[in-house]
Design a protein with these regions (language model features):
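Short amphipathic alpha-helix used as the core "switch/output" element in two-component signaling
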Residues: 48, 70-81
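Two-component/phosphorelay signaling modules centered on CheY-like receiver
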Residues: 6-10, 17-38
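Interdomain helical linkers/hinges and coiled-coil/dimerization scaffolds
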Residues: 101, 107, 113-146
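Alpha4 helix (beta4-alpha4-beta5 surface) of REC/receiver domains from two-component response regulators
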Residues: 71, 92-107
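Helix N-cap/capping motif at the beta->alpha junctions
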Residues: 39-48, 69
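Receiver (REC) domain active-site loop signature in two-component systems and cognate sites
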Residues: 64
Length: 146
């Protein structure tokens, strides 16, 4: 049973527009694998969820009230460098993408989201998460052995 729980990925969707969050949840539901999906309508709320839950993947917009997606990414990565963050934005301004890269964001995707592109970036991020979980599991087993 513990092995099954290890395969579940905790995902946080952050967007101030409910319809956008619903759209991303729908696209996620079409992907293979099991996920716990959390939602936040701004970066401030998202940071609280990241701190209280074991979030492994964040899907966030950039422009939101209280704290934008770039500031959220910066703060979240400071607290959890292993966190996978995918930014979905309607802004094609290269400075946003540059800043996202500087903060260690996994991917930067333009809206409207192409389902095929979504599939590719989710698979890539979840593969990194699964590899990290396996590595942590091996390290724990190694410590228990000693």
């Amino acid at each position: 049973m513990k092995n099954m729980a290890n395969k579940i990925i905790n995902v946080l969707i952050v967007d101030d527009e409910k319809i956008e969050r619903e759209g991303l949840k729908y696209l996620l539901s079409r992907e293979e694998g099991e996920r716990n999906v959390f939602e936040a309508s701004n970066g401030k709320q998202a940071l609280q969820i990241i701190r209280s839950e074991d979030i492994q993947l964040v899907l966030t917009d950039i422009k939101m009230p209280h704290m934008d997606g770039l500031e959220l990414s910066r703060r979240a990565k400071e607290e959890n460098p292993a966190l996978q963050i995918i930014i979905f934005s309607g802004y094609s301004d290269f400075t946003f993408a540059q800043e996202a890269i500087r903060y260690g964001v996994t991917e930067y995707i333009l809206k409207p989201v192409n389902p095929e592109d979504f599939h590719k970036v989710i698979q890539k991020a979840e593969k990194v998460i699964e590899q990290r979980k396996k590595k942590e599991s091996r390290e724990i087993k190694g410590k228990n052995f000693l």
